Every structure is written in structure tokens, then in C-alpha cells.
């Protein structure tokens, strides 16, 4: 289904693929990709070098990120939004926990849209990325979003997901600085068989690329004869999931299908044809034969942990036993897992089916699911099913077409445009429950279970079609390719009347006299200190998992209700992975604050004595070690919570994503790495002393000798901090992005 070609290729006239071409060098021909055409047009330097400084055309945020972004920008000198900035309310939109705090955030958002000239999308009107697809994208444009699934390449608009700090830079008319990326040709051939949906293709792509990191920080450019065989919703469903490959962004060729999207959304002027130049070079290629694609299931605890549904059916006990063993390794005695119990008479029984969000809740997905369930029902046993249309226009369309009625008649509960099932704030399964979902992720506990309280539920990702086939079979996991159905629903008809009624669009019409409306949970950022000459950090968490997700660094779900309150939110940092982290970090921070007052603790004094350093010019902070941290969400809180608790550094072998590393930098956390052949067999309580770190960072150095202080003595360690821009170095020296702007008035 998916073939990786790990060498460069030339694409001639958009049709012919060659390994070699004599008329143009790779660097010259790479400029002819769609990717470079868009990136270069957004580079404020206008050059063709290896560095790019990008200004975006528009931005997107949702209600668990925009408050922090605006608070940071305010503290850094914000006066007016200089570009269209849409704020959707699709995460804490149920306002089900924390009393008034969620709606307080929404009220703050509307007041900010009025004051600074923003776009405000009220609760449950649309999930963030569907609103962007409907109202914000333009061919050849770039959108920056404070959500990792900011991907609109299938509509000719490059999307990038980053932490809030990068959006703050754009609000202050600064740039997104990157090295010129490599570009990967994703060549689509054939057409998918009946019953195969976008999630099947996307899961296969993630399976083929994630573990090796082969497309990490590269741009995926989709082309080939198979593109024309995919409707827009199908393309969008693949595109949104490219985030899970750890690629930087994505872009597709555009055609009549894309033109039709802009036409029905009453924006024909925003369409233009995008295609590679006559000779374009790609650094590698992925070939996908759509005709051989099977129905897939991504098992816990990652979208890449995938098999075909037929493979699961052939060996259910063996495959689920391996998942159980993985769960026991991750959670130890905290939870009691019985996944193999889901095998009944040789078949796997799910407890819940969900179709939701930016990937699942499309018109086409819901229409085809309804066709599969037509005349059937989900039964009255333990299996339940819910569907969430991804916007009010989609909800209106499925209602008018009778799709809603068909789903409700089959026993599916219809719910509003809401991202809850994707981040643990809605439809949390029962303990030991197995939920099959057409959503973006199935990370540990992302569905809302709390292992610290003995809870664990499990999520497997499947396409909406196979979820519907499973629902029609009473929850027995079933491939949609194995059922007979006819999809007779009419094409999607878009109606934006509800947006015209409800969405506030104040871009270009800022009202600076407007007072921001604060609830009691909305707090300013605490004071953060500049970097001192030397750095002493104590390990507060040491994680040897292959990958550490941002969901583990700071949980989502109901915890996200506190994202407007930095101190309160930080109490949940690593709570589901390293429960003792917060207490250790607070004690370290307490000792550093005492040191700044001239009261050096015995703990700090002994460590400094061991390395011959003094307390006056040596900061003391906490540090997290993880093998590969930062996979998943763009949430800046994965880093800011560490900083609020006194975190000064991360140490790892590599960062899972650029966006997490950028979050660390913007919050003044030095992103150290160590060589892959170096063992890190230290434990919480051990310390790392980095002499002369401030001077080294400001001088442009990329590595430094440090010392690890353990009970057994002092050991050397060599740390790297590579590929930092001049601005990033100054941000680290100043202590965080806010300090950087405050000190320089940039």
C-alpha cells in the first residue's frame, strides 16, 4: 500500500519520475516544487538561501490556547492584530467542569476580538480546522495555528501547527524562522475500493513513516494520477493526519475538485491552480497505491501502531496480548488491563464508536456511515455510538439530506461541533473499555482515563466506514470492505447563514477602547528570570519510554480548563506519567528563590562545592530527561508548565517535533541533546552543572562540557544545543519570549 523510496527523485512535467536528470541540480529543481514556491513568496528576506523567515497570511487558535497567546502578546506590546486571527471555541465548549472558567475564557476571547480586531467563532459553531477550510484558506497562502493539526494542504494552503510563542511573534510582526526544509513527493496512484476511507490511507502513511522519523520536519507534497480519484473530504482526511508523521507541513496539487470547494464556499477568487514546475526535485518519495489500501485499525497507544482489520481478525488474542503487555509496561501496577477479554468467540468486541472532529466529522464520512447503517441498528447491549458533525454548515447539510435521521434511527447519538473525543473532554469510555474512533490520536490517556486513580480505557483508530460497519454488527470489529451498502446521498451543499449570524469578524476594525473581560481563573504569567552565567539543574523526571507525548507532559481533557491559569495548570504537569514531578520541581524552585535572597540550601551548596562553583552566578532549576519528547499536540503548556515550576532545561537524544523544541525555547528552557551512543542512566535527584552556559549560547556555540553530580561523585557529560537562531539564543538568555520583547521593545 505504501512504498518508501529513500533517495531523491525528479518529477518532469508533473507526470514522469526519474532518479536522475542532467539539466538541473537538486537545489535548483527543488525551487520548482509547490512547497518552495509558497515558502519563498512568504520569506521576508526574499532570497534563495538555507534560512527562511516566514510571515503568515492568517492564524487560527481555539479556546484552550488563545487566552495564553493573547496574554503573552499583551505583555510583549500588542496593540492590534496585524493579520486575520480566528479564535474558535471547540474544546472547552461544553462548559461542563470548573464552574464558570470555560465560558469566562470564551467571553475573554470575544472581548479580545473586539479590542484587537480578531475573528471570534462562538462555541460549537465549528471545530477549528473545519472553520479554516470553510472560511480562511486560500490557494498559495500559509496559515499558522496553535494546534498541531493545522493542515490545509489539500486545499492549496500550507498549514503549520506551532506553540503559542510562534503565534505571538506573528502578532508582533516578527517571523517564523526555519531552515529551508526538504520536500517529500507523495505520489498517489489508483483509486480506493468501496469501504476504504481517508483514515485507512492516513493510518497506513503514519505506520510507514513515524517510527523511523523519515519525514520529520520535511514537507509532504501530494501529486500523481490518484489525486483526481479522491473527493475533497477524502483529501482533507488524509492531509489532517500528516501531522502524525511528524512532517513540518503539507501541500497538494490543486484541480477542479479544489476549485469546486472554493466555488461552493462562495470564494472562487481564492482558488488558483498549483502544480510543480516542469522540472522539480524531491528529497525522497512515498508511493501510495490507493487501489490496494485495506481497512485499517491503529491500536493503542499510537496512530502508527497499525494493522489491517483482517490481520486483527486473524490473530486477535496474539495482537491484543501485545497491547496488554505494552500497557503493563507503561503503567505498572497502577491499572489492571484486560484487553484480551474483548475477544469473544474469536471476534474483537468494541464498547464504543465515535466519529468526530477535524478528521472524522466530515459530510462524506457521516453520509457513508449512514448508508452502511441504513435499516440496521447498534443494538441495546454495551456498545454505544456518537457522531459529531464538524461545523454547523455540515450539521445543517446532514440534517437536510436525512443523514442525521438515518444515524439517529440506527441508535447513533448526534452531538455538536466539538473536539472533545479527540482530547479527553467528551465520551470518555468506561474503565477497560475499548473505543474505536475516527479522530486524530489514540495516545495513552488522551481519551480521558486517569491511571493514577486506577483507570485505563483504550482507543483504536478506524475509519468512519468501518466504525459504522462495526456498529451495524453490534460492536464486533468489522471492515467496511466486508459489508454491502449503497451510498446514495447527494453531494454536500454549503450554507453559511449561521456564520453570518453568529461569527464576529473584526479584522481591520480594532476597538482599542474595549476592556478585556477577565474571569477569576484568567491569570497573568508569573515572573521568569533571565539566564545566569552558570546553570545547575536537578533531574525532576527521567523517562526512558521510546517517545514521550505532550499529553504526558501536560494532560488534556478536563485539565485543559485551567490553561488560562498558569500556576493552577502547572499542578498537572506529568501527573499521569511521573506523579512526583510537580512536588520535586516545586522544592527545587523554592530552593532557587531562597538562593536569590542569599539563603543557599544545603542541597545546592553541596552540589556547587562538588564542581567548584558559586551560588551568586549559578541558577538552580529543574530538568526533564526523556528519550524523544514532544510528539503530538502543539500545546505550549507542555513547556510553559515546566517553566512555571522553575524548569530550566530538557535533555534528550532528539526532540520528536520542531514545535515542542520551539515551545521550550520560547519559554526559556534550553533544549539540550546528547549523542545517541551516550547512556543516560541517572535518576531524579541527580544534578547537571553547565558552566558558562549563558556566554556559550550568546557566542553562537553549539555544544558544551557539563558535569553530572550523583551520590557516587561527579561525571562528565557533553551537551549539544544546535541550530539555534540568533533570536532564539537571545530569548533563552533573556529567560523567555516575554522577557525578550520586554527588554528589547521589539
Range-by-range predicted roles:
Residues 1-746:
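Fe-S-dependent hydro-lyases/dehydratases of central metabolism
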